[in-house]
A protein has these predicted regions:
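Hydrophobic structural patches
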Residues: 17-19, 171-182, 204, 216-218
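Short, solvent-exposed loop/turn positions at domain surfaces
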Residues: 20, 73-74, 165, 177
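DNA target-recognition domains and sequence-specific DNA-contacting regions of bacterial/archaeal
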Residues: 2, 32-161, 231
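Non-catalytic DNA-recognition/assembly elements of restriction-modification systems
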Residues: 12-42, 215-231
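Short, recurring structural edge motifs at helix starts
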Residues: 2-4, 15-20, 142-146, 155-163, ...
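Extended intrinsically disordered, low-complexity coil regions enriched in Ser, Thr, Gly, Ala
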Residues: 182-197, 204-210
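Intrinsic disorder/low-complexity detector
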Residues: 2, 7-10, 208-209, 226-231
Length: 231
């Protein structure tokens, strides 16, 4: 049987910022204790497509949110505010987790977590936007075709917390900086895809035409293209 000291040692991360290497062991705290679920309501008349969030417009793979296509036909919806972390609780494996940067309303199948400490918002967001958390939710999910996470189980999710708030903030800042780089790279990739799509349209003859609109200099006098079978 492991001693308490052995368990404490196991709660020290392998990689740690130099100034925190002697700060002591981390501990696990239930999610409910640091970011409880909130059940506040807001009138639908105060919500628009821009600030309404449902399981449909939270994007997969921690991709953020899109503008909602429609609003529900109800009087009120769940309320969230900037700094909350939202989880689409239908088919959790789709990884629809979003850290809110504005206030609004959410559908009933979206869980709203509110960090008790406003300085811990980023940290909680990174904990929930993590495959380990998603695997945990799926392990306790109920249903086959449309599995839902078990709310009581989710509340008990063990969140690793360092002994000093400053370490928690530095970890969150580091991960957020990486997210920004990833986001910029994703935009570059999307831009390149659009550029390639445009080139494809220019480098091949359009329907009903025999020469492309854009041609390499050495082939501009090579004549018209024709159709042949490949292989």
């Amino acid at each position: 049987m492991r001693s308490k000291s052995d368990k404490k040692k196991s709660l020290v991360p392998r990689l740690r910022f130099p100034e925190f290497r002697e700060a002591g062991a981390w501990e696990f705290i239930p999610l409910e204790a640091i970011a409880p679920l909130v059940n506040d309501r807001v009138q639908l008349k105060d919500i628009s497509n821009v600030n309404y969030v449902s399981t449909e417009n939270i994007l997969q793979d921690f991709g953020g949110v899109a503008v909602a296509n429609k609003l529900p036909t109800v009087n009120s919806v769940s309320s969230f505010q900037a700094g909350d972390v939202l989880l689409a609780n239908i088919r959790p494996y789709l990884k629809k987790v979003w850290a809110a940067n504005f206030s609004g309303g959410a559908s009933n199948d979206v869980l709203v977590f509110r960090p008790r400490n406003s300085q811990g918002c980023q940290y909680v967001a990174h904990i929930l936007k993590n495959n380990r958390f998603i695997d945990y939710v799926m392990a306790g999910a109920k249903g086959v075709k449309m599995p839902r996470g078990d709310i009581n189980s989710i509340k008990e999710y063990p969140v690793p917390i360092p002994p000093e708030t400053t370490e928690q903030q530095k970890v969150a800042h580091c991960l957020s900086s990486l997210d920004e780089v990833i986001g910029l790279q994703a935009k570059k990739v999307q831009s390149l895809k659009q550029h390639k799509k445009g080139l494809m349209q220019q480098l091949f003859p359009a329907e009903g035409e025999t020469t492309p609109h854009l041609r390499f200099p050495e082939f501009r006098e090579a004549g018209a293209w024709d159709k042949q079978r490949i292989g």
